[in-house]
């Protein structure tokens, strides 16, 4: 296993939809292992393949069921798709490994149903609410070429983009 570099905004790959995965092969299994190590090292709740520079529709996540549990264990979703949404909620203080040093309130659905396949190619259907619903929406957005800053007000988004441009200019 290896730690992977996390791609950050404004990298162009983050703004492009990912390619669907057709075969689960040894390379994909290695990618899952490397993404898992990277997720826990970061630390984060979820990580999409595109966030480590891989143009594949896959994500890994590990979300505690409630405040008292440590973890539900790592889950892998390949070619995930949101098939049902319900209710509205604001994800407070949402952040992202690819959008460092910025957090914002983000409008999300309160409940989602997600379908995809796991790392063994078995069909998966997840009915999620609460934090899990927010994490799944956030990571699936990555696979569709969207960042959470694309879902916030244009004023907050442009403030962040200006800050990043200024920092990049200062770096040379």
Swiss-Prot record:
Its cofactor is Fe(2+). Binds 1 Fe(2+) ion. It comes from the Bacteria. Keywords: Hydrolase, Iron, Metal-binding, Protein biosynthesis. InterPro entries: Peptide_deformylase, Peptide_deformylase_sf. It catalyses: N-terminal N-formyl-L-methionyl-[peptide] + H2O = N-terminal L-methionyl-[peptide] + formate. Its EC number is 3.5.1.88. Removes the formyl group from the N-terminal Met of newly synthesized proteins. Requires at least a dipeptide for an efficient rate of reaction. N-terminal L-methionine is a prerequisite for activity but the enzyme has broad specificity at other positions. NCBIfam families: pept_deformyl, PRK00150.1-3. This is Peptide deformylase.
């Amino acid at each position: 296993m290896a730690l992977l570099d996390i791609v950050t905004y404004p990298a162009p790959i983050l703004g492009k939809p990912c390619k669907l995965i057709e075969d689960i092969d040894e390379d994909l299994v290695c990618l899952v292992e490397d993404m898992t190590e990277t997720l826990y090292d970061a630390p984060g709740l979820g990580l999409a393949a595109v966030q480590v520079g891989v143009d594949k529709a896959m994500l890994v996540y590990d979300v505690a069921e409630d405040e008292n549990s440590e973890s539900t264990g790592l889950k892998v979703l390949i070619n995930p798709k949101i098939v049902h949404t319900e209710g509205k909620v604001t994800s407070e203080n949402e952040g992202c490994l690819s959008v460092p040093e910025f957090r914002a309130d983000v409008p999300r659905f309160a409940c989602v149903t997600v379908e995809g396949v796991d790392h063994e190619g078995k069909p998966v259907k997840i009915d999620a609410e609460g934090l899990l619903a927010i994490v799944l929406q956030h990571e699936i957005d990555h696979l569709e070429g969207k960042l959470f800053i694309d879902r916030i007000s244009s004023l907050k988004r442009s403030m962040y983009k200006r800050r990043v441009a200024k920092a990049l200019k200062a770096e040379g």
